[in-house]
Regions:
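Exposed, low-structure sequence patches enriched in small/polar residues
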Residues: 1-197
Length: 197
């Protein structure tokens, strides 16, 4: 069946513990997401938001800045309960960036993001995502802009697997890859064994 969600978020963060001066961040977002049935377990996904953020600090510890923009996503997902699930979306983000004592500049990003989940029997699962973005903006894009996407090309991939070993142990592993302007071919492998009592 079709589903529609509309929500509003307003967040504020204030820190006064740093001897160098206080720091204040605020964010507001009005968002909408629709899930429209195409056929069977396949859905059309439409998502968008209007957002703003503001960062200020004492003694100019950070460059005071304001951001106004929008986010849009369009894609298809398929949910087969207990089997293979996937979600693929095209994205376009745009932000207006206003730095203190500077003219407003614009930044935009487009790309595709894919996620999937596969159940392995009753006790295991493997899930992952592969994303590609291209952002075009000023040389120094604040981390709040474009949903955190860095300037230029970004390739990000993540695979996580978990399996239960009996009733008290689980084995988990993660492989993570990131390549963008900030991190050049960053690669991370992590594994853990958890005991449940």
């Amino acid at each position: 069946s079709d589903r529609h969600r509309i929500w509003y978020e307003n967040l504020s963060y204030f820190s006064g513990f740093d001897l160098r001066g206080w720091e204040k961040k605020s964010q507001a977002k009005l968002a909408e997401e629709s899930q429209l049935l195409i056929k069977g377990s396949r859905y059309l996904i439409i998502k968008g938001d209007l957002h703003s953020s503001k960062v200020s600090s004492e003694n100019n510890r950070f460059v005071d800045r304001k951001i106004f923009g929008f986010l849009s996503e369009l894609g298809i997902k398929e949910n087969k309960i207990g089997r293979f699930q996937w979600d693929s979306r095209l994205i376009y983000y745009q932000d207006q960036i206003k730095l203190k004592n500077s003219d407003s500049e614009y930044a935009s990003a487009y790309g595709i993001k894919n996620s999937w989940l596969r159940f392995i029997g009753k006790d295991g699962r493997i899930e992952g995502n592969i994303d590609y973005y291209f952002a075009d903006g000023p040389s120094q894009i604040p981390p709040e802009a474009l949903n955190g996407i860095a300037n230029g090309e970004t390739i990000k991939a993540n695979i996580t697997a978990s399996i239960l070993l009996g009733r008290s142990l689980s084995l988990n592993g993660t492989i993570f890859y990131l390549d963008n302007l900030r991190y050049n071919d960053f690669f991370k492998i992590q594994g853990e064994i958890r005991a449940h009592f």
